[in-house]
């Protein structure tokens, strides 16, 4: 029972870090990055589908993204979705591909994006701590029900705390790295 509770908590914490990593990838830095388009979806034959599944996305230059749809008839829909997104970029359509020039970020915009990154990092930390709290409740229930001894539960709690600190440190590192990317001119 203890091993199950720890494994379940660790799996959920890993997922929280993975979500934080995806969130950080969607925050635009001054450089072109295919990940910035991962959350943009279009209506593809009645289904909301991410652009990343409908087109190849390449970065030929530091500030240029080239998007080549697998189906030419999706070109306009992809262009419109990018234009309507919150990325602050203006795509140009040449009939076969979409070019997206990534503009230089202003100092004010950089600060806003750093705040956004810190906020997403804090959400991920809270998520990890909530997972820890639920796992601790499960461990206390196991001890109360007599399914495991005091020493086993105490050891499991230490392991859980160690895992929690490890995952929080990973999230902190993601935020720090993103902050460095954003403030780099």
Curated annotation (Swiss-Prot):
Q: Which Gene3D superfamilies match?
A: 3.30.1360.40, Ribosome-recycling factor (1.10.132.20)
**Similarity annotation:** Belongs to the RRF family.
- Segments carrying the region annotation (Disordered) are 143-163
The lineage, from the top, is: Bacteria, Bacillati, Actinomycetota, Actinomycetes, Mycobacteriales
Q: Name one GO biological process term.
A: translational termination
Q: Under which name does UniProt file this protein?
A: Ribosome-recycling factor
- The question of whether Ion transport is a record keyword is answered with no
Q: Out of the domains of life, which is the source?
A: Bacteria
Q: Which gene encodes it?
A: frr
| GO cellular component labels | cytoplasm
Q: Which PANTHER family match?
A: MITOCHONDRIAL RIBOSOME RECYCLING FACTOR PSEUDO 1, RIBOSOME RECYCLING FACTOR
Which HAMAP family does the record cross-reference, listed alphabetically? RRF
